[in-house]
């Protein structure tokens, strides 16, 4: 069997392997076994708005129940909402999210949180995967539901609904914003436009922003099972930017399908990605004495402008591999309370154990409220360097390209040309036979030329 778990759980086209009801059923049994081994009696399930979510939820719940573990269904709720419930519901040994994040509606995925609302480690993920394909006496396949005698049958767990799951999560979010709130609340409430991406935030977001006194307009908040992420959300902010300008709003907020990432729009319609939001929030936390160890965790894909901004602000930073799980791992190791990716995944561990789009939005808004500054003013903290990314198809065997003299020489030439004013990152794709070439520099045309020259060297080497 091929490996099921990718960089963020199991993912694929719904109703095609591995995103089938058969795999979902076996995954439910495997997760139940994992939860039971860690003293859990309950597994939480949440999902986004994709049409296939109901189907996969039913299979997962059946698998979990068949192993004698109770199921609590949270319904449509953001991924970080499942993490929150997994950390707070008594007896919860795991939480399962059915979502494919920012992907089109025809895709879906399954990702797992362990008790405490934490993402699985690589060994824990491997253990669950081994349970899915286990051939032992407790294997997670259909035979476990076919006991030879009634004495050997497992008593099924119950399957029930958490009727107020969204409200519980919304109350948690509002409490995070209101913590230590002082007299700086503006006389006029901020005017906000929120793009729910027709996804998992469409129920929770209206319970949060108006409750906190913001004049809020919601767009793309009418999911139909097929319109999630369609020309909306964190990857398609054009409509949001136009609405912010036309309504005179102070800012716009765009979430992805499962609302674990945030992209912001300032009052002039300019987009702020994760790097710039992280710089704004880190600087404010430092000023308030809340930036533990004076440290922020970023990734190798973070813009060089973020590194330069943090250095200028006197804030230390460590770069990790790509993925919010890598960021969180380094945060735990170093005691950092803030980290994230330019894609909009940001972790504020002072409040939550995972990336959370709505929480990130509230942290950004708190900076605006506390400083009484516009978002465009705050955004001047960081200059985003032009970044060019190109892909080159290569052999699936993934040879060590730095051992090929012509490629190594060209990369070194570009690095020397950029000096400290830019950088080069060449890495293999995690899912496709591609070499990704990323070059950053102060001049866009020169950066394009540098990136193309490296790609040409790779193509000529025929790797």
Swiss-Prot record:
Mg(2+) binds at residues 101, 256, 258, 260. The active site is at 101 (phosphoserine intermediate). The modification Phosphoserine is found at residue 101. Keywords: Isomerase, Magnesium, Metal-binding, Phosphoprotein. Its EC number is 5.4.2.10. One of its GO terms (cellular component) is cytosol. Catalyzes the conversion of glucosamine-6-phosphate to glucosamine-1-phosphate. This is Phosphoglucosamine mutase. It comes from Desulforapulum autotrophicum (strain ATCC 43914 / DSM 3382 / VKM B-1955 / HRM2) (Desulfobacterium autotrophicum). The gene is glmM.
């Amino acid at each position: 069997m091929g490996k099921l778990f990718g960089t963020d759980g199991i993912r694929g086209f719904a109703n095609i392997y591995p995103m089938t009801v058969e795999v979902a059923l076996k995954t439910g049994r495997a997760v139940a076994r994992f939860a039971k081994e860690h003293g859990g009696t309950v597994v939480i399930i949440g999902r986004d708005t994709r049409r296939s979510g109901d189907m996969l939820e039913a299979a997962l719940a059946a698998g979990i129940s068949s192993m004698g573990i109770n199921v609590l269904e949270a319904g449509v709720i953001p991924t970080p909402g499942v993490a929150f419930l997994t950390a707070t519901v008594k007896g919860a040994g795991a939480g399962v999210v059915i979502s494919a994040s920012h992907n089109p509606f025809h895709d879906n995925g399954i990702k797992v949180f362990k008790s405490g609302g934490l993402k699985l480690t690589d060994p824990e993920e491997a253990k669950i995967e081994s349970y899915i394909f286990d051939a032992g006496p407790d294997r997670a396949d259909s035979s476990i539901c076919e006991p030879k005698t009634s004495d050997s049958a497992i008593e099924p767990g119950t399957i029930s609904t958490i009727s107020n799951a969204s409200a519980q999560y919304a109350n948690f979010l509002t409490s995070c914003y209101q913590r230590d709130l002082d007299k700086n609340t503006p006389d006029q409430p901020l005017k906000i436009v929120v793009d729910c991406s027709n996804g998992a935030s469409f129920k929770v977001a209206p319970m949060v922003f108006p409750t906190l006194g913001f004049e809020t307009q919601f767009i793309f908040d009418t999911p139909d099972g097929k319109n999630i992420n369609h020309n909306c959300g964190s990857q398609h902010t054009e409509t949001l930017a136009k609405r912010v300008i036309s309504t005179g709003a102070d800012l716009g907020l765009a979430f992805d399908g499962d609302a674990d990432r945030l992209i912001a729009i300032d009052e002039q319609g300019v987009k702020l990605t994760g790097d710039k939001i992280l710089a704004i929030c880190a600087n404010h936390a430092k000023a308030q004495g809340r930036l533990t160890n004076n440290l922020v965790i970023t990734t190798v894909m973070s813009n060089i402008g973020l590194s330069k901004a943090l250095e200028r602000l006197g804030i230390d930073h460590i770069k990790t591999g790509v993925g919010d799980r890598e960021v969180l791992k380094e945060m735990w190791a170093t005691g950092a309370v803030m980290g994230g990716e330019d894609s909009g995944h940001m972790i504020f561990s002072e409040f939550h154990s995972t990336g959370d789009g709505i929480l990130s939005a509230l942290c950004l808004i708190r900076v605006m409220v506390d400083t009484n500054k516009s978002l465009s003013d705050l955004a001047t903290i960081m200059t985003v360097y032009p970044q060019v990314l190109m892909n080159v198809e290569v052999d699936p065997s993934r040879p060590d390209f730095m051992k090929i003299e012509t490629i190594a020489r060209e990369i070194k030439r570009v690095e020397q040309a950029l000096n400290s004013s830019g950088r080069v990152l060449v890495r293999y794709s995690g899912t496709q036979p591609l070499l990704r070439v990323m070059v950053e520099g102060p001049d866009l045309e020169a950066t394009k030329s540098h990136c193309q020259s490296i790609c040409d060297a790779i193509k000529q080497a025929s790797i």
